Structures are given as structure tokens and as C-alpha cells.
Amino acid sequence: MKYTVSFEEIVWFDSSCQNDREMASYTQGCLILVGILVTLSLPYSHAFWGNENKIQTAVFLSPKFVLGPGSVENRFYYNVNFPKGHIAVRSFDAEVIDEAGNPIPLHETYLHHWVVVRYYVRKGVEISEFDDPRKFNESDYISGRNSGICQNLGQFFGLGSETRKTSTHVPNPYGIEVGNPTEIPSGFEEQWMLNVHAIDTRGAEDKLGCTECRCDLYNITVDEYGRPLRPDYRGGLLCCYDHTQCKVKHGFEAVRRTLYLRYTVKWVDMDRSVLPVKIYIFDITDGWKRSRCSTGIIAEHECKVEYDIESCDATGIGNDGCIDTRRISLDMPFGGYLIYGVAHQHSGGTGSALYREDGQLMCSSLPTYGEGEEPGNEAGYIVGMTTCYPKPGTVEISKGETLILESNYSRIRHHTGVMGLFYILVADELPKSMHALHTVVQTQDSIMVVTTLWAAVALIGVVAVIVVAAHYRLKREGEDGYEAIGM
């Protein structure tokens, strides 16, 4: 938005104020109006907010992976493409596509999850896309994880089947800061790892069972390292690791196809106008317990990531209100302002929420289920999770405060390997000018920032200028007319 006034108009008003003795009483007002006009002739970004920080966009492809009916891809790709420099990420979106760039529906290739993790590698040490992290020399590799709180959930970005219809937008003036030279260890460089876990369910005997990684459908009794599974482990990540095979219908055939994860990153250059946010991930399976010596730090949190849901029939409970509700209490080892929140759930999920200890709702996230066949609307699958964007400054987390995480699932049928994660962004500070310059209008999935104060000033200024000019001209014309008659 830019209000432009010509130099001639400014001079005309200034000379009018100075040259007409009959307008002496208006001189002060005219000078004020001249000031308003000069101010309004500047772009608002320069007049009030500083230099505009342009949003940049890049689209990347993961290394290709090839899937046939029932097969599984769960690879870790190192040193993947990512924007360079000291930047603030504003969004990170992804989806599975084929070689022609066509989106692949979940009922053909189920995207269990994708995650992006930062790490630092010693300069001169080559890490290929397909390296095994267990072979890394510890002195050459340093984790660049998020701020907490689970030891094994260090990703910066990540979603699952809900990826196409879940907002990852970080509202202005915030951003996820990466590439900060002062944070990169001396002699190291920042790189990124991408993990893609996808399951081809074409022709599967039980599509949902394959996506929930039921061990009987994969005929798995040991994990990917050859260790025997627990007798009570019926399904989850330990049964659908890379190159496993889910059971397909007898005689079903389909071509193997090459796929990619296409990911789109939006960012701005990091400068003083951007306020960095920190990433925290909570897990409903977290085994943390309060004790005299507990501090809530990462080392104290044992997050199992997945759990099972027993059906109502198995527990003798009717279908009415047949919901599995789990709650845990967590003491916050940090403080700040909640900027964004979203949950991650699997099929059967009915929503998740974050509460204060007194029961006050801080943020909720609900699943959207598809109703059709096309990508982004696949019936029976979670195709999106609602997000929360609290009005800046309204939801503050105090260090040491106890929060309650809740995760809900339907128990109409048995589920294995479900998740109950909650991802939040927290800022240490608020923009100093936000309350004076903006009115924040919240919707469930996005925030529309409406610049009102200076627009109102601009409108008032323009109207005032027009009124004064019209009044002066009418008065002058009237006086000229009386003089002519008098002569």
C-alpha cells in the first residue's frame, strides 16, 4: 500500500497557506497537512515499518524412490537441497508426486511421515544422500536439533498424511531462524537430512492395516537390526521399516513406479525485523514424571512416539462416546509467547489440545478427513490438521509452568502405531510496534493481519486536505465575486 502525492500539490498547499492573508488562521493546519502529505507520499514500509523483507520461494525434489504394491520406503537422505544463508523460514510444505509431477493419492501411496532434521558436519567431510548415520564419526557430526522437549524428536519440520491441507505458515514478523553463522560450530557447516516414510497400498488386503504397520500383515517378528520384537508388539514403526512388504491380494499386479517428495520452502533473509521462534514438540507417550530434582530438560523425557488403541468391543464398552482420551502433565523448561501450534495424528484421531493446569484451553488441533478419491481429499484418511495462531501476546508460557497435553482417538476399531504429537512455535518477545500498528484478526487456520491505524490516518489526512482546499477555494471565489460587483 502506498499513498502518492505530487510535489506540485504540496507546494500549492504550502503557498496557499503562506500567500493569502485571509487564510492566516489556517496556516498551522496547513503546515500539519503538508506534513501528513509528505509522510503519506512515502511507502508505508519505509515510513513506519522499516525496509520490506521479500519472501523467497524454492521448490525441491527428494532423491527418487521406487515402490511396488505393498512395498515400503523409509530412507534417510543426507545433505538434501535447502535454501542457503542466514534466513528465517516462513513455511515448509511437501507432497508425494510421480515422475510427471502428478500428486499421488494416499490410497495408492500412503505418506506415513516426512521429517527434516538439521545437523552440522565438519568441513571437508563428505556425507552422501544415502549414508548410514551409525557409521558417522562422532567428531565429524553434530546434531542441530530443535529446542525440545523429546530426545528422539529433533526435527525442524515434518508431517504425515495431513501434509497437503495443513498450514505451516509462520506469521510475520516471525520466522524459524537457520543458517546463523554464530550458531554453527567452528570448522563445521550446516546441512539437512530428509526422512521419507511411504507405503504403497495398491492392491493391499487391508489398506488401513498396512498404513498402521500391523506386524502380521508384514510377517515381521524382528526389527530392522534383527532384534526380536516384544511379544505384545502388534504394530508400528518396528514392523514397516525400509524394504518390508505388506500383504497384497492374491494375483494383484501393478507396475513399480518412481516417486519423489516435492517440498516447497518459503523464507526471508534474516534481519532485525524478523523475530525468531523456537520449535518444541510434545508427545502424548512421554514418560516424564515430576520429582524433586526434575527440571523438564530434554534428557528427562522418554518419548515412545507411538501407541495402540484398543477397540470398544475388546473392553466391553459400547460405541456411544467410544473415545480413547490420554492426558499427560509436563513442566515447561522454557518460557515465551505461543505463536503457532498443530497436532499430528493418524487415522482414527479426533483431535488434540494443549491446556493450562487450570483447564484453560491454549491451543487445539482437529483432523480433517477426506471424502473423495482425489489427492488432498482421500476418503477415510486424515488429509489436514487445523492449526492455531493465537493473537500475539495473548498466550504466554511461563518457565516452570505445568501444561496438559491431550490426545483423542476413536475406539470403534483397534489401531496400532498411532501418534499423538503436538508441535508449537514459541517466541521470546513480541514486536514492539504490533499493538500500535495492527489489528490481528484470527481464523482457525490462518491469521489475517489488517493494517488499520495508518490507513485511517491516511484517509483522515486526505479528507482533511480536500475539505480545507475546497473551503479555501470557495471562500476565495466568493470574495472575488463580491469585489467584482462592488466595482
Each language-model region and where it sits:
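Classical eukaryotic N-terminal signal peptides for Sec-dependent ER targeting/secretion
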Residues: M1-V34
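N-terminal non-cleavable signal-anchor helices
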Residues: S6, W12-D14, G35, T39, ...
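Compositionally biased, intrinsically disordered/low-complexity regions enriched for serine, proline
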Residues: W12-Q18, L40, F60, S273
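Cleavable N-terminal signal peptides of Sec/SRP-targeted secreted and luminal proteins
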Residues: T27-Y44, G461-A464
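Beta-strand-centric surfaces of beta-sandwich/beta-rich domains
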Residues: H46-T451, A470-L474
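Single-pass alpha-helical transmembrane segments
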Residues: L453-A469
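Cytoplasmic C-terminal tails of single-pass
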Residues: E477-M487
